[in-house]
UniProtKB/Swiss-Prot annotation:
The gene coding this protein: rny
Lineage, uppermost ranks: Bacteria, Bacillati, Bacillota, Clostridia, Lachnospirales
Pfam assignment, any one: HD
Keyword Transmembrane helix recorded: yes
TM region positions: 1-21
GO BP, sorted A to Z: mRNA catabolic process
Protein name, UniProt field: Ribonuclease Y
Keyword Metal-binding belongs to the record: no
Subcellular location: Cell membrane
Annotated Gene3D superfamilies: Hypothetical protein af1432, K Homology domain, type 1
InterPro entries in the record: HD/PDEase_dom, HD_domain, HDIG_dom, KH_dom, KH_dom_type_1, KH_dom_type_1_sf, Ribonuclease_Y, RNase_Y_N
Length: 516
C-alpha cells in the first residue's frame, strides 16, 4: 500500500514537471520570436543605410577617378611636349657636331696630304744628304789619309786626353784646397795638444842587471852544485847569467813581470845574506806580492794622472801590468797615458766629451797587458775585456777601431786613433828592429814598382817618403796626379806603418847630344 502511494507521488511529480517544462518552452519561444522580429527590422534599416552610403561613395570615387585620369593625361601631354623639345635640341647639337666633324675631317685630310708630300721631300733630301755625306767622307779620307774608324779613334783619344787633363787639374785643385784647410786645422789642434803633453821614452830590453857587493856573492848565488841558481830560475822563469862582468848578475827573460820579480827577490836575498832554496822560495813569494802591489799602484796612478775615475778594479790592475810591456821600445803604459792626455786635449779643441775621450785613450791598448796569455790580437782582447767589465759602446768602438779594423761610430774613435798615431809616430817614441825596418822599406818599393809606367822607386827618410821615377813616354804630367793618388791608396791598403808616407812622383826628360 505504501509502495503504491510512493509510486503515485512520483508519477504526479513527473507530470507536474513536464507541464512546467512545456510552459517554460512556450514562454521562451515567444520571447525569442519577439527578439528576432526586432533584429530583422534593425538589419533592414542597417542594410538600407549601407546601400545609401555605398551609392554616395561610389559616386565620389567615380568623380575622383575622373579627376585623376584628367590630371594624368595633362601630365603626360606636358612631358611629351618637353621630351619633343629636348629631342629637337639634341638633334640640332648632333647636326652641329656632324658639320664640325666634317670640317675637321676635311682639314685633316688636307694636312695628311701635306705631310705625305713633306715626307717624300724629306726622303729625297735624306738621300741627297747621305750621298753628300759619303762624298765628303771620301774626300776627307782622301785629304787626311785616315779612314773613318781611324778618325773616330783619334777623336776619342783627343777627347779622352782633354777629359783626363781637366779631371787631373780639378782633382789637384780640390785636393790642394782641402789639404790646405785640413792641414791648417789639424796642425793647430795637434800642435796645441802636443805642446801640453810631455811623455817619456823607454827603451825595449829583455835583460835586467843586479849589482853585487862583491864577486864572492856570485858563488853564493850559484850555490852548492848550482842548486841555488836552479831554484831561483825554476821559481821565477828567468835565466840568470853569471859571467866575467864584475860585481853584476844579468837576468834574462822575455816576460818583464817575471824579470822584475826575480830582480826584487835577488836583491832581497843579497841584502839578507841567507841564500838557500827555502829562503829563495820565501823571497820569491814576497817579491811576487810586491810586484802585484806595484802593478795595482801603477794602474791607480795612471788613472789619477789622466783624471779618469770609475774604471773596474781588474782593468786598473791590467793597466798596471802594462808598465812591464813595451812595443818597439815604447812603454805600453806610458804610451796609453800619452794617448789619453792627447785624446782629451784634442777632444777639448773639437768640442766633444773630454772625459770619455781620455777613458777611451787610456784603455785603447788594454789588450796588450794579456796578449801573451790569451789568443787573438791585442785589439780583439781589449774589446772583449771592455765588454766584460761593462765599458760604454763608445769606448769599445774606439778600442776596436784604433787600428782601422772596423768603422768609426763616433768622433771619439777618430780622436783616439789620431792620438795613438801621434804618440807612436813622434821622433824617438818607438824603434824598430833592423829586419822589420828593412822589410817595410822593401815592401814600400815593391808596391810602387808594381804600377805601370814606373821606372824605379826609392824609399827614403826612414820610410816616411818614397820617390817614384816614371817613364816620361808612358806617363804624362796629368797622369802623375792620378798615379800619385793611386799609389797612396795602394800603400794605405797594403802596408802598415806609423804616421804618414809622402809619395813623390817625378817625371824627367833628358836630351843628350855631342858637339864634334
Amino acid at each position: 500500500m505504501l509502495i503504491k502511494i510512493v509510486i503515485a507521488c512520483v508519477i504526479t511529480a513527473i507530470i507536474v514537471a513536464l507541464i512546467a517544462w512545456k510552459s517554460a518552452i512556450s514562454y521562451y519561444k515567444k520571447v525569442v520570436e519577439g527578439k528576432i522580429g526586432s533584429a530583422d527590422e534593425k538589419a533592414r534599416e542597417i542594410i538600407d543605410e549601407a546601400l545609401k552610403t555605398a551609392e554616395t561613395k561610389k559616386r565620389e570615387a567615380l568623380l575622383e577617378a575622373k579627376e585623376e585620369s584628367l590630371k594624368t593625361k595633362n601630365e603626360l601631354e606636358r612631358e611629351t611636349k618637353e621630351r619633343r623639345a629636348e629631342l629637337q635640341r639634341y638633334e640640332k647639337r648632333v647636326l652641329t657636331k656632324e658639320e664640325t666633324l666634317d670640317r675637321k675631317t676635311e682639314a685633316l685630310e688636307k694636312k695628311e696630304a701635306k705631310l705625305v708630300a713633306k715626307e717624300q721631300e724629306l726622303d729625297r733630301l735624306r738621300v741627297e744628304v747621305e750621298e753628300s755625306h759619303q762624298k765628303q767622307v771620301a774626300e776627307l779620307e782622301k785629304i787626311s789619309g785616315l779612314t773613318s774608324e781611324q778618325a773616330k779613334e783619334y777623336l776619342i783619344k783627343t777627347v779622352e786626353d782633354e777629359v783626363k787633363h781637366e779631371t787631373a787639374v780639378l782633382i789637384k785643385e780640390l785636393e790642394s784646397r782641402a789639404k790646405e784647410e785640413a792641414e791648417k786645422k789639424a796642425k793647430d789642434y795637434v800642435v796645441t795638444a802636443i805642446q801640453k803633453c810631455a811623455a817619456d821614452h823607454v827603451a825595449e830590453t829583455t835583460i835586467s842587471v843586479v849589482q853585487l857587493p862583491n864577486d864572492e856573492m856570485k858563488g853564493r848565488i850559484i850555490g852548492r852544485e848550482g842548486r841555488n841558481i836552479r831554484t831561483l830560475e825554476t821559481l821565477t822563469g828567468v835565466d840568470l847569467i853569471i859571467d866575467d862582468t864584475p860585481e853584476a848578475v844579468i837576468l834574462s827573460g822575455f816576460d818583464p813581470i817575471r824579470r822584475e820579480t826575480a830582480r826584487i827577490a835577488l836583491e832581497k836575498l843579497i841584502v839578507d845574506g841567507r841564500i838557500h832554496p827555502a829562503r829563495i822560495e820565501e823571497m820569491v813569494e814576497k817579491a811576487q806580492k810586491e810586484v802585484e802591489t806595484m802593478i795595482r799602484e801603477e794602474g791607480e796612478a795612471a788613472t789619477l794622472e789622466v783624471g779618469v775615475h770609475g774604471i773596474h778594479p781588474e782593468l786598473v790592475r791590467l793597466l798596471g801590468k802594462m808598465k812591464f810591456r813595451t812595443s818597439y821600445g815604447q812603454n805600453a803604459l806610458k804610451h796609453s797615458i800619452e794617448v789619453a792626455i792627447l785624446s782629451g786635449l784634442l777632444a777639448g779643441e773639437i768640442g766633444v766629451d773630454v772625459r770619455i775621450a781620455k777613458r777611451a785613450g787610456l784603455l785603447h791598448d788594454i789588450g796588450k797587458s794579456v796578449d801573451h796569455e790569451m789568443e787573438g790580437t791585442h785589439v780583439q782582447i781589449g774589446v772583449d775585456l771592455c765588454r766584460k767589465y761593462k765599458e760604454s759602446p763608445i769606448v769599445i768602438n774606439a778600442v776596436e777601431a784604433h787600428h782601422g779594423d772596423v768603422e768609426f761610430q763616433s768622433l771619439i774613435a777618430c780622436i783616439v786613433q789620431a792620438a795613438d798615431t801621434i804618440s807612436a809616430a813622434r821622433p824617438g817614441a818607438r824603434r824598430e828592429t833592423l829586419e822589420t825596418y828593412t822589410n817595410r822599406l822593401k815592401q814600400l818599393e815593391d808596391i810602387t814598382n808594381g804600377f805601370k809606367g814606373v821606372d824605379k822607386s826609392f824609399a827614403i827618410q826612414a820610410g816616411r817618403e818614397v820617390r817614384v821615377m816614371v817613364v816620361p813616354d808612358q806617363v804624362t804630367d796629368d797622369d802623375m796626379v792620378l798615379l800619385a793618388r793611386d799609389l797612396s791608396k795602394k800603400i794605405e791598403s797594403e802596408l802598415e806603418y806609423p804616421g804618414m808616407i809622402k809619395v813623390n812622383v817625378i817625371r824627367e826628360s833628358r836630351v843628350t847630344d855631342y858637339a864634334k
